[in-house]
Amino acid sequence: MSRPLYLRTNEQEEAVRSLEWAETQAQLIANEPYHWKWVFIALHNAAQGFMVLALWNGNGLLTLRPKIATKWLTAYENGGPFPTEKLDEFLNLYAKVKDAGNFHTKGSGPFNGKHSHDLSLDKLNSIRNEFIHFTPKGWSLELAGLPGICLDVLELMQWLGQESTAILWYKPAHRVRAKRAIRRLMRTLQQLAKRCDA
């Protein structure tokens, strides 16, 4: 068997692998709390991926920043040139999956989360950004609330990927892997929450 020459991926593989990586990192937290960093980074990437999949609608325009989507449509109508595609901001994608106007098939949406989901997605985004754009400083992150934030995010992903028809999984294995990773990660986070409360 020859060695691969390329790393191949796509939007579904990215979302599922990021979710699986968050689950792998969460299992290490009991021995080393620093793994929370990698859970937040991977879970942010996975949640963003699931929202992108849910908003794809056959052309991906809803996933782009509004000005870019408008320029893309204009270029399409006029035969080009096409703009560089830029994914919309994380919290804008979240607002879009909560907007009924963005879903046109039965059972696809919108996500009707609770206020805690809004707070948790905002917190996930903030913490992830602190890690990704880390400035010179000392920083302490209280562990007690972290499992709850992640559980809320997983509820969004479970709804988008398993309970609604928003995501069209073109490989059944992606759906199965996502379901398994969500279930395992929820279990791990619930155990971590109990430890934080003890």
Residue spans for each PLM region:
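Amphipathic alpha-helical interface segments
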Residues: 2-108
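Histidine-centered, metal-coordinating catalytic motifs and their short helical/loop contexts
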Residues: 110-141
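Polyanionic, low-complexity intrinsically disordered segments
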Residues: 2-7, 119, 136-198
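Generic macromolecular interface patches on structured domains
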Residues: 32, 56-57, 131, 138-141, ...
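General structural signal for secondary-structure boundaries
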Residues: 82, 86-93, 113-114, 139-146
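A structural signal for well-ordered alpha-helices, especially hydrophobic packing surfaces
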Residues: 26, 47-54, 128, 132-135, ...
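Charged, amphipathic alpha-helical oligomerization/scaffolding segments
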Residues: 14, 21, 45, 96, ...
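Short, structured coil/loop segments at alpha-helix boundaries
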Residues: 5, 12, 20, 111-121, ...
